[in-house]
Structure formats: C-alpha cells, structure tokens
C-alpha cells in the first residue's frame, strides 16, 4: 500500500527572527486573537518605488505562502513573494528606536528616509 502525503502549503523564504516572533506573539496575546497572522506585503509607493506593509491579517488569500516562527504565522502574498525572498524581519528595541525592521537582500536601493526601496 502506498501512502501519499497531501501537498503542503507553499512556503516563502522570509525569516522572522526570534525577537520579532516574540514581539508579534506578545501583540497577538494582548489582543486575545489566535486567528491572526502577520502579513508582509510589497506595494507601490514612496520615493524609491516600493514600500513594505507589515500587519496582522485574519484573511487567507489564494496563492498565499505561509511559514510559522515561534507560534506566529507569517504570510506573504504571491505577488510580493519575489520581492521579499530571503528577507529577514527583526524587532529592535534600543534607545534610538523601537520597531520591526526588514533586511532585504533584493533591495538595490532605498530613499533617504528609509521608507521605501527599489
């Protein structure tokens, strides 16, 4: 008898660091919602042409790619996936700044303010 595995959902190449996963999990726990996932999307905008959009989402879209990090689902839509392949999302908490940061090896340049990339 042959057992075939069901095809798994397609995963993306974005990495959520331990610090970012812990912060996202903390925010989700504060909201009391276990149905939300962290979504990263790339949209037109900013002076360099493209900008990131990072938000919690309760929707699953056709073609979404999903991976889980520390109990947090990270979703990338199929149109954004090529732009963020190999990117790393971190959470920084220092005197100078606090927030999520994205290190993307595909970005060839960014604007002076750092809000957008190309």
Swiss-Prot record:
The keyword Acetylation applies. GO terms for molecular function: 2 iron, 2 sulfur cluster binding; 4 iron, 4 sulfur cluster binding; iron ion binding. Keywords: Acetylation. The modification N-acetylthreonine is found at residue 2. The keyword Acetylation applies. GO terms for biological process: iron-sulfur cluster assembly. Disulfide bonds: none annotated. PROSITE patterns: HESB. One of its GO terms (cellular component) is plasma membrane. Belongs to the HesB/IscA family. This is Protein Rv2204c. It comes from Mycobacterium tuberculosis (strain ATCC 25618 / H37Rv). The lineage of its organism: Bacteria, Bacillati, Actinomycetota, Actinomycetes, Mycobacteriales.
